[in-house]
Each structure stands twice: as C-alpha cells, then as structure tokens.
Amino acid sequence: FSIKTKYSELKRAFRMIAPASLSSGMIQINVLTDLFFASKIVGAAAALSYANFLVQAPLGIVSNSILIPLLPVFVSLRSRENNFKLIKKIHQGLILSTSSMIFLGSIFISLSTPIVILIYERGSFNQNAVDVVSQLLIAYGIGMPFYLCRDLLVRVFYGIEDAKTPFRVSTIAILLNLFFDWFLIGGSSPWGELSPLHLGVNGLVFSTTFVNLFACIFLLFELNNKLDNLLL
C-alpha cells in the first residue's frame, strides 16, 4: 500500500512538473523570436538587453516578495470548501501585484532617461544609445502590470494542481508573439517588407505586453470557470 501511495504521489507530481517545465522553456522561444526580429534593426538586440536588465532586477525582487509567500497559501486553500478564501487571496494578490507594478512602471516612464544615464552612459554608450534604451524602458513601464499578474495567475493554477492550462497559454503565446513582433516592428528588411506599422524595436516590447495581456485575460476566465464563476 505504501509503495502504491508513493507511486501515485510521484505520478501526480510528474503531471505537474512536466507541463510547468515546458511552459518555462517556451518563454525562451519568445525571447529568441524577439531577437530574430531585433536582428533586422542595427543595435536593437543590444538595446533590448540593456533595457531588459533594468526591468528584470527590480521586477524579480518585487515578484519574489509577492509570489513566494502566496503560493503555499494557494495550495492550502485549493480544496473546494475554501473557494471563497482562495478567491479573496487571489483578489488581494492581484491588487498588490498590480499596484506595485503600476508604481514601478511609473518610475520607469517618468525617470527613464536619468536611470539610463546613471547606469549606462559612459564610454561608447552615447546620447543616441541613451535615447533608444530610454524609449524601451518607457515601453516596458507601460506593460509592467501584466507581467506580474500573469505570473501570479500561473502560480494560482499550480496551487490548484492545474499545470496544463498555463502550458496551453504558453503555446498560444508563442504564436501571438510571433504575429505581434511581425505586425508592430514594421519597416523593410533583407527578408522583405514587414507590416506597414513602424514602431521599430519598441514594437517588440509592446508585442510582449499584448501577449501578457492576453495571458492574463485567458487565465482569469479559465480560473473563473474552475471556481464556479465566483472570481469575476
């Protein structure tokens, strides 16, 4: 009986780990897609890396401080009789993550140029580079709330032992990211004409924002269905 129980628990854990690992790996496909389109613009890949570094450092600190304490709470409240408590914690998490990201995003938007100058402007990193990275930082700031909301909702699904839904969302996100990268970057390239829009490298950041927005909406509706339409 003990061996059978352990095997059952191991099988259940594998059903969670396999889709979750694949979902995490799919994020790198989106990064490679962005770099492919960035290669069509001189200096775009480097600018994306510089701006992304400025975003990921504070984002990682804030996300860990919010998501790590909430995950065990979601797990402990996953039983059906605790739906109302689970929904309350989800609402609290969404409010906290959104408000913190709006605050962080507003800093990036309002202080983008001073931040880039302070961190990067030296040597061959001239004013033109400052302007490009500052614009990217503003674009990242606009989409900040959707980054953490998506990650929070994914943790909720893991907490209720559903890793397949985030996996499906990650799969669809790859296709959406490919389309939005093509549609928003605009201009011409050695590979032919792109879409009529001309957002340039900023379009790659807005593409990520739209993909994260889609993920948030899709996950919210799926979660609402799982919680008997009590979430929304």
Where are these regions (language model features)?
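Interfacial segments at transmembrane-helix termini and the short loops linking adjacent helices
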Residues: 109-143, 194-198
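Interhelical loop/hinge segments that connect adjacent transmembrane helices in multipass membrane
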Residues: 1-27, 225-232
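Interfacial transmembrane-helix starts/ends
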Residues: 14, 49, 70, 82-111, ...
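Helix-loop junctions and terminal segments of transmembrane helices
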Residues: 63-82, 153-154
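Interfacial/gating helices of multi-pass transporter permease domains
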Residues: 16, 36-59, 127-134
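Membrane-interface helix-loop junctions in multi-pass transport and translocation proteins
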Residues: 1, 164, 174-217
